[in-house]
Amino acid sequence: MINKFLTIFLIFSIVIIKVLSQSSNEQPLNVVPYPQEVTMIGCNIPLSVGSISIKSNIESTILSISISRYQSLFFPFVSNNVLKDSSSNIELSLIIASDDETLELGIDESYFLLVNQDTYQIKANTIYGAMRGLETFKQMVVYDVVENSYSLTCAEVVDYPTYQWRGLLVDNARHFLPKNMVLHIIDSMGYNKFNTMHWHLIDTVAFPVESKTYPKLTEALLGPGAIITHDDILEVVAYAKTYGIRVIPEFDVPGHSASWGVGYPELLSNCPGYPQSSIPLDCSNPYTYSFLENFFSEIAPLFQDSYFHTGGDELVIDCWANDTSIQKWMKTNNYNTSDAFQYFEDQLDVILKSINRTKIAWNDVLQHGVKFDKETTLVQTWTNINDLRDVLAAGYKTITSFFFYLDRQSPTGNHYHYEWQDTWEDFYASDPRLNITSNAENILGGEATMFGEQVSTVNWDARVWPRAIGISERLWSATEINNITLALPRIGQFSCDMSRRGISSGPLFPDFCSLPDDLSFSFKPVYQLSKDEIKLILKKK
C-alpha cells in the first residue's frame, strides 16, 4: 500500500514539476507554438545539408506533398562545415494510424515526436497530426550562423492543440489579393499551425468572385482582372488542405451589400438619403432569396468544408424602415425591423440546409433580436467580452475575434504600447476563455482578423507577422504557457525562420537574422552605380 502511494505521489510530482518548468521557469525547446509536453534528452546531432530523409508507413498524396515541402525547408543555407559522412544521415520515420485524408472541424492533430541518438520518429493518428509534428521537427533543425553548421535538437514531445478552431481571416475584397498571394498566406499559416482560413471574399466595395450563374456580379471589381475564378478557388482549397487548413468562405449579407447591386440593382433596398455603402439587400423581395439560393448552390461545392459564413454584421437596419415597399411588406406581415431580420436569417437557414452547409454569423445579428438554431449555427464574436458572455449565456457555440484584430494598431482597451509591433504581447495574453466562468467549453477557438482597408500584397506580411505568431501560440499551446519574457526569444527566432522561408516577418527586438542569398540579395537599385561613377560623384562636395 505504501509503495503504491509512493508511486502515485512520484508520478503526480513529476507531472507538476513538468508543468511548472514549462509555464514558469523554462521553455527549453526553441519551438513555436510551444508543445504541450517537452522532455529534453540532452544531445544535439550534427547534420550536413541534405542529410535528412523521411519515410512514412502509409501512402497519401497530401502527406507526400507535405513531406516534399519540408524536405525543401530543412536546409536554407546550402553550404556548411559539417562533414558529409554517413553518421550524420538520419531517416525520420512517420508512423500514422490512418491514411484517411478527410479534413473537418475537430480532426485529430495530436502527435508524438522522439529524437535521440538512435530514434527519429513521429507518431500520429492522422496525416494532419503528422504535419504538425513535421513543423515541430523542422524547427528543431538548428542553423548556427557563426559556425555555419546544422544540428538537430534531441527531445521527446507530446503535443496537441488547446483549441480546435485556430483561424485567420483573409480579406480579398477591400484590396484584391491574387491567387498566388493567397497561396503564400496559406504557407505562412501552415508554418504557425493555424487550421482555418476564413476567406472574406466580398464586401461593399467589390465583388471579385466569378459567378457563371450571375456573371454581372463581377461588374463590381476593384480593377481589371481583379477576379477570383472557380479554378482559383479549387486550387486554394486543395493547397490549404496540404497544410491541414480548412477554407471557409464568407459572403456577407444582408449588409455590406452595395457590390451585389452594381450588376443586379433589383437586389437592393431603396432608401433615399442613405449612402450607397449602407444599403442592404431587400428582405421583402422573393427574388433576393431565389438569387441567393442559386448563387450559394453554385459556389458552395467549390469548398469542401461544411461551414459557410453569411456575415450579418453592421446592418443599417433603419434603411428597411425607410423603404416604402419594405414598409408595406412589414405592415402586411405585422413585422418590425427585427422581425424582418429574423425572416431574412430564417430564409438563409433554409437555403443553407438545402446545400448541406452549417451557418456562421457575426454576433451583432443577435443584438437585433434575431435567434438562431443553436445546433446548426456557429456565432463569431467580434465586439467585446461582455457580448461574448451574452452569446455563451444564450447557449451558442462561438469563436472569438475581438482579441485578435490585426488591422488595429492596438487591441481594444489597451493603449499603453508605443510600438505597434509590441501589440503581439496583448494578443499573446488574450486567451479566448480567460475570465469566462460559464459555458467556456462552447468557445471552440479564435480567429485573427486582417481586414484589408489598408493592407494589400505589398504590406500584408508585415502587418500580420510576427504579431500573429503570438496568436498561433495562444490558440495552440497550454494556457500555462503564457510567460511573455520566455516567449519573446522563441517568437523572435521563429520570425527569422519564417523570413528564411520567404515570409516577410519582421523582428521584435534588435537582433541579426541571416538570410539565404536568394532572399538577402533580392533588393537591387533601379540603377547600379559603377565604381568610376561613385568616384566621379564624390569627387566634389
UniProtKB/Swiss-Prot annotation:
The keyword Lyase does not apply. Pfam families: Glyco_hydro_20, Glycohydro_20b2. The gene is hexa2. CDD domains: GH20_HexA_HexB-like. It comes from Dictyostelium discoideum (Social amoeba). SUPFAM superfamilies: (Trans)glycosidases, beta-N-acetylhexosaminidase-like domain. One of its GO terms (cellular component) is lysosome. This is Beta-hexosaminidase subunit A2. PANTHER family: BETA-HEXOSAMINIDASE, BETA-HEXOSAMINIDASE SUBUNIT A1-RELATED. GO terms for molecular function: beta-N-acetylhexosaminidase activity. Gene3D superfamilies: Chitobiase/beta-hexosaminidase domain 2-like (3.30.379.10), Glycosidases (3.20.20.80).
